Amino acid sequence: MNELSSVDWSRAQFALTALYHFLFVPLTLGLSFIIAIMETIYVKTGNERWKKITKFWLSLFAINFAIGVATGIIMEFEFGTNWANYSWFVGDIFGAPLAVEGIMAFFLEATFFAVMFFGWDKVSKKFHLISTWCVAIGSNLSAFWILVANGWMQYPVGMQFNPDTARNEMQSFFEVALSPVAISKFLHTIGSGYVISALFVMGISAWFILKGRHIIEAKKSLVVGASFGLVCSVFLFFSGDESAYRVTQTQPMKLAAMEGVYQGEHRAGLVPFGILNPKKTIDNNESVFLFDITIPYALSILGNRDPNSFVPGIEDLIHGNEDRGIEPMQERIDKGKIAIQALKDYKLAKDNNDTAAMATHKSILEANFKDFGYGYLEKPTDAIPPVALTFYSFHIMVALGSLFFLLFIATLYLTMANDIEKFRKILWLCLLCIPLGYIAAEAGWIVAEVGRQPWAIQDLMPVHIAATELGKVNVQISFWIFAVLFTALLIAEIKIMLTQIKKGFDAYAGYSTLMGKGEK
């Protein structure tokens, strides 16, 4: 077994931080809107029971929000400590949306969070309601700007490389912010957060019904959660369709890994279920699947909006396909090396004040810059992501998403029919789907990030070039420190939440409840 390098440990540390952080983010995104909806019902009806319900869910939101912020701050610092080359190469672009997020979105939600949490009976009902909606909007604005940054890494646009500084510089902020890849990534990510939040509300409400406690409040919460989840599941279906389309156009290797496509084909079928052959590689003729179910034409429709279109496979992207205008990977690597050498020659000519040579080398660099990152790959197969992990993560995400959609329909129907108590298996399934929701979301992020390997920035910078040159021991130590810290934070959140949940709706779930002085 190969020993892990410093870069591998840096990747593992960032993956650890991101996956832990994303345990908290989805609940913040969706639960904030669910709380706002519940409080709107309270303000419209004046029913104090809805106030009780709102304050209960607000207390759980506050716990999750605080710990989510802590893990997010650590992740931002890792860009500078573990990925200094990346920060230098694209900091001018990547930092802009993060700065806007801090100035606009985070301060919006932080300001109104205090009013939302501590302002009960201190400000008017309408102002408190406005504050709650501002927190929900601010939380989702934060997600937008962060996902704009991530979307740019997947599809870099709106910039120009400056050979004098060896940095990419922003040319169009709006092209970066309104990139179709960034927009589709934002919509799909917040959609998953909304579904997780709906499952969270449904699961806890189901627990109360199973225990025979707070039946009225639990049923009302169940209706809101299931309704919200059903609408968001439909939204998630369409945003996922758009996301897959964008991946096909901008990251064909990722799509090939997602669906286990080795040989490209016209009228390509979609595999909703399959077992990959572990012996299959690009260099042999083994079957791709040990078992699979295929829907004809579906992948061509999903990827190109045309049932007769061609979907390239891994072999096409590595060996090339002249008929489809796909360059062999080795040619892209060669062009990348030409671009890298042209940059070196440009700097040397600049040191010698040779303007003619500078112009020549700059021209060569610009002609080959789109393949710049490929010059750092040792061999064509380095451009292939981990196929099995990407494939199974994608299919787990889709399968669980389909399950959630059916659960929302069943739960909403049975609750509205006032029969939900009779279907205890459905209630237990609601409870079980809380962790399953997080598994689906984490699987989605694995698809997004593992599926684009080896790239830190698509086509421009591989991960091993983006990393800071750190001693392996230093990264190992920080990895285990973060692993222990994040695990402790997760355990603390779960423990505090369970304590709060056990208090029930009658505690009113205001700020005083967290201090042990809940209203009775």
PLM feature spans:
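Hydrophobic alpha-helical transmembrane segments
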Residues: V25-I34, M104-F112, G193-I204, I396-L412, ...
